[in-house]
């Protein structure tokens, strides 16, 4: 049985309404898992735990990336089969773009850790990863908002909160760039090389 046959059987098995729900839930909860892993990683710096790339904190972050990537793949199936339109289609496309950015940034983050060792909160891989996080949360929000499924609509406040948290996380990290050494000095100890800009 070829991969194409398996893909066709899976895409025929799932109803579009179920897949749309899965895309939005995976995009939102994947974002929450990523933020949780990122905050946990920052806390581990405060505790001065040893740092290497495949820590449990990074595994948590990249579990979230896997969730949003799964949302992107499922969303791609819906778009290819032309089962979406309007705001729903726009939301799915945003999730796909966000998950692609996260995958590319995650690979770059792994390479960066291999080359430079510990990197800070502000690095050439972290901010694109966080931007992809915002896109996934935004796409999930748009999907939920445009959907008529009342069960799924119950997640709307949670999706708004997730989007706000994702924007806040990127905003905090970008404030380190604007504040430069003044902001970095008090938190340098906490985040080890938290203000390193690669």
Region spans (language model):
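Alpha-helical transmembrane segments of multi-pass membrane proteins
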Residues: 31-45
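Membrane helical hairpin/interfacial module
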Residues: 57-101
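Short, Lys/Arg-rich, polar N-terminal cytosolic tail immediately upstream
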Residues: 1-19
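Hydrophobic cores of alpha-helical transmembrane segments in multi-pass inner/ER membrane proteins
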Residues: 2, 59-76, 128-144, 191-198
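Membrane-interface helix-loop-helix junctions at boundaries between adjacent transmembrane segments
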Residues: 52, 85-94, 108-161, 172-185
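Hydrophobic alpha-helical transmembrane segments of polytopic
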Residues: 26, 30-33, 61-64, 94-102, ...
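Intrinsically disordered, flexible peripheral segments
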Residues: 51, 55, 167, 181-190, ...
């Amino acid at each position: 049985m070829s991969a194409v046959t398996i893909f066709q059987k899976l895409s025929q098995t799932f109803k579009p309404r179920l897949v749309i729900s899965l895309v939005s839930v995976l995009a939102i909860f994947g974002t929450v898992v990523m933020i949780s892993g990122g905050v946990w990683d920052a806390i581990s710096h405060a505790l001065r735990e040893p740092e290497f790339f495949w820590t449990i904190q990074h595994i948590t972050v990249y579990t979230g990336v896997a969730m949003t990537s799964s949302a992107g793949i499922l969303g791609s199936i819906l778009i290819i089969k032309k089962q979406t339109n309007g705001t729903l289609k726009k939301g799915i496309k945003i999730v796909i773009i966000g998950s692609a950015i996260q995958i590319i940034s995650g690979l770059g983050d792994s390479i960066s850790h291999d080359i430079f060792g510990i990197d800070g909160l502000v690095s050439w891989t972290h901010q694109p990863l966080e931007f992809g996080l915002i896109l996934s949360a935004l796409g999930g929000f748009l999907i939920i908002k445009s959907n008529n499924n009342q069960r799924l609509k119950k997640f709307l406040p949670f999706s708004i909160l997730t989007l706000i948290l994702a924007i806040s996380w990127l905003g905090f990290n970008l404030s380190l760039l604007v504040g430069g050494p003044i902001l970095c000095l008090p938190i340098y100890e906490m985040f080890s090389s938290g203000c390193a800009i690669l």
